[in-house]
Amino acid sequence: MGAQDPTDEDRHVCRDTGRKQGLVGKYDIWLCRQSFREMARDMGFKKYD
């Protein structure tokens, strides 16, 4: 790790809003849960009852 390398906290932020909390990182999605709920259907995820 060099002096310019981002920390884990800086590296993992929501790609849509820039938030650091409530991230969905599975499959390298990196969206906060609110953004994921809005975009999940467009990304091909299906909601099951």
UniProtKB/Swiss-Prot annotation:
GO CC, any one term: cytosolic small ribosomal subunit
Whether Ribonucleoprotein counts among this entry's keywords is yes
Q: Looking at the Swiss-Prot or TrEMBL record, what is one Pfam family this protein matches?
A: Ribosomal_S14
Could you tell me which InterPro entries the record lists for this protein?
Answer: Ribosomal_uS14, Ribosomal_uS14_arc, RIbosomal_uS14_euk_arc, Ribosomal_uS14_sf
Select a single GO molecular function from the record's annotations and give it. structural constituent of ribosome
Biological process terms in GO annotation: cytoplasmic translation
Which protein are we looking at? Small ribosomal subunit protein uS14B
* Domain of life the protein comes from: Archaea
List the gene name: rps14b
Could you tell me what this protein does? Binds 16S rRNA, required for the assembly of 30S particles.
Q: Which family does it belong to?
A: Belongs to the universal ribosomal protein uS14 family. Zinc-binding uS14 subfamily.
Record note on quaternary structure = Part of the 30S ribosomal subunit.
Lineage of the source organism? Archaea, Methanobacteriati, Methanobacteriota, Stenosarchaea group, Halobacteria
What does the UniProt keyword field contain?
A: Ribonucleoprotein, Ribosomal protein, RNA-binding, rRNA-binding
